[in-house]
Amino acid sequence: LEAVGAEMPTTVEELKDVLLKFANEDPNGNGVKDELAMFGFDGGYRAEIVQYIINAFVYCNKDNVFNATEGKVWNPYVTDEYRQALIYMNDLYAEGLISPMYYPVSEDAELKALMSPADGVSMVGIAGAHPSLHFISDFYRKYFTFALFFLSI
């Protein structure tokens, strides 16, 4: 965040502004536009960043399709808030703020893509992680420059 002169975002609008800075500025300082603003993968243990962002609009636990509020069961996938979340995510994707590799990759492919940049330095603005992962192992420090904050629910 310091490298792009940004504060920790607290709204989805602020998040988009930070992602734009990650994508359009050069936070790793190598003079090449090679940063990924947001990257994760669907199927990784709590690495599905999209799920975290959707929860900014409506609580949506993909492992439990229904919610219960005040004794009423309801499905978040048919709410206006969920539709707004999809519109927001579509906008992020259309602006190149979500990596196009997000859905079609496996965990191995994701790591290979991030660990093999031409200049040997990777920069990811936002990466997903389970809240219990409170440390970054030496393995990841070897390959990644973390300018990021971890999202958790």
Stretch-by-stretch model annotation:
Residues 1-153:
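Extracytoplasmic/secretory soluble proteins
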